[in-house]
C-alpha cells in the first residue's frame, strides 16, 4: 500500500462583474469566477483582484465570495519528486550560542 500525504486547502471563489455604460445606462457584465487561495472576505478578494495584471486596464468589482475547503491527497513518492527542500530556521538556542 502506498503512503499518502493529505492536506486541507481553503480557497475562495470570487464572482466578478465589470460596469459598462450602454445607451446612457450602467450595466454589469458578469465575468468568469476567479479562484483565490485562502478564506477571503469581499474586501480582501477585491484587493487581490486589483493586483492582477488582467484587471489593471479594465477593473472588475467583486460582487460575491464563496469559501470552500477540500482535502487533497497525493502519493508520497510523487510529492517527493515535485517538492523542493527547504532549510529549517535555526532554533533560538542555536542562535543564542552563535551570538555569544
From Swiss-Prot:
Return any one Pfam family short name. p6
Its domain of life reads: Viruses
DNA-binding stretch(es), residue numbering of this chain? 1-19
Signal peptide segment: none
Give the record's GO biological process terms: chromosome condensation; DNA replication; viral DNA genome replication
Q: Which GO terms describe its molecular function?
A: DNA binding
Sorted alphabetically, the keyword list is: DNA condensation, DNA replication, DNA-binding, Early protein, Repressor, Transcription, Transcription regulation, Viral DNA replication
Q: Which family does it belong to?
A: Belongs to the phi29likevirus histone-like protein p6 family.
Its UniProt domain note says:
The N-terminus is involved in DNA-binding.
Q: What does this protein do?
A: Histone-like nucleoprotein that binds to the viral dsDNA and responsible for wrapping and compacting the viral DNA about 4-fold. Forms a nucleoprotein complex in which the DNA adopts a right-handed toroidal conformation winding around a protein core. Binds ito most, if not all, the viral genome, although with different affinity, the highest one corresponding to the genome ends. The formation of the nucleoprotein complex at the genome ends, activates the initiation of viral DNA replication. The binding of p6 would recruit the complex formed by the TP and the DNA polymerase to the origin.
Q: How does it assemble?
A: Homodimer. Homomultimer. Binds to double-stranded DNA giving rise to multimeric nucleoprotein complexes. Binding specificity for the viral DNA is based on supercoiling, the viral genome having a negative superhelicity lower than that of plasmid DNA. Interacts with the DNA replication protein p17; this interaction optimizes the binding of protein p6 at the viral DNA ends, thus favoring the initiation of replication.
Name the UniProt record assigns to this protein: Histone-like protein p6
Amino acid at each position: 500500500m502506498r503512503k499518502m500525504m493529505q492536506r486541507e486547502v481553503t480557497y475562495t471563489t470570487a464572482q466578478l462583474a465589470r460596469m459598462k455604460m450602454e445607451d446612457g445606462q450602467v450595466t454589469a457584465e458578469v465575468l468568469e469566477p476567479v479562484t483565490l487561495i485562502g478564506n477571503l472576505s469581499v474586501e480582501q478578494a477585491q484587493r487581490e483582484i486589483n493586483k492582477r495584471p488582467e484587471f489593471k486596464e479594465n477593473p472588475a468589482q467583486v460582487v460575491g465570495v464563496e469559501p470552500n475547503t477540500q482535502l487533497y491527497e497525493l502519493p508520497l513518492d510523487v510529492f517527493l519528486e515535485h517538492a523542493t527542500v527547504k532549510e529549517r530556521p535555526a532554533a533560538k538556542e542555536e542562535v543564542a550560542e552563535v551570538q555569544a
